[in-house]
Amino acid sequence: MHEQAIRVRPAEPADHPAIRDILRTAYRQYTRDIPPAVWGPYLTDLLDLDRHAHHGQLLVAVVDEAIVGYAAFYPDASVQGFGWPAGWAGGRGLAVDPTFRGHGVAMTLLTALEDRARAAGAVVFAFHTSAFMTTAVALYERLGYCRAPRFDVDVNAHYGVPAARPWPALAYLRRLTARPAARNAA
């Protein structure tokens, strides 16, 4: 169906409306899982692309010039305010247009994030997700990411919103090594 090549590029300000649409659409499925008192601050934070761009780089996945995915890259994950150590890189807000799910967009974005982390000299690439984001958790574990409970975050407390239900953000990380050089077929 979507057999076109996926490429990742830095986002431009003109891309922000499309990115926000993808974020709203991709995260809408979690409105029942996220405590209602926290949903508003969480979505506002995800959609604050200017702040994410100020501290990192916004990336978009593109197929035939259409934006089909997004992720924010933080060369210094400690600036995110989630307790990551200095020297680690981080990601935030990974989202894929639902019509392009299952076609490698998330994996392509993760590869681009890891490549940027290596280029920045980071020894670890880290991010948070939630247990109810089961498809994402399965992808991360399949790719070799490890749980790091020491860095889990209480999202309700992070946003300063008391909620009846707890919402832990689960920390995942991957220790980075040099990417193997491509082999030439002889």
Question: Residue spans of the language-model regions?
Answer:
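Conserved N-terminal entry element of GNAT/NAT acetyltransferase domains
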Residues: 1-17, 21, 178-186
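Structural signature of beta-strand start/N-cap positions in the alpha/beta core
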Residues: 7, 57, 99, 123-124
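Acetyl-CoA-dependent GNAT
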Residues: 13-16, 21-98, 110-112, 116, ...
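C-terminal "cap" of GNAT-fold acetyltransferases
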Residues: 87, 123-126, 130-186
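Conserved glycine-rich acetyl-CoA-binding loop
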Residues: 93-111, 118-120, 131-138, 142-143
